Amino acid sequence: TDASHSIGANFISDEIYHGIQYEKKAVSALEVTDECYVINSFSKFFSMTGWRVGWMVVPQNHIRLVERLAQNLFICSPHVSQVAALEAMSCEEELSQNLNVYHKNRKIIMDGLQHIGLQTFAPPDGAFYFYIDISKYSDDSLSFCNDV
């Protein structure tokens, strides 16, 4: 945050995938400072993609500014989405089960990649995306993916 403030910028943390961690807990920007914007959603961790429900935490002195901006950009999420999102927050057992499925799938993919010779990759520590080094097979990732 010091770096962003030194150039007159605000620090924005996209925390859409928080909650989907495997090895260690992700740190929220709010654990470091209150002088940040945090963007989050029910889409990923709560498996509510398409329900159009999310939230934003802003510094106290910017709340009214963001409210005015939001009033001109969108109205609100559908009522049914808001009710479902509130209920989803109390579904701890289901959320834990979902995370276990992600964790098992992550292991299957990691083992499978190693089995087929793709042994250099960054395992996902949050979310479920793999960044794989394919340089010994191709220098063109698009062609490689099309061939696969």
PLM regions: where:
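PLP-dependent class I/II
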Residues: T1-V148
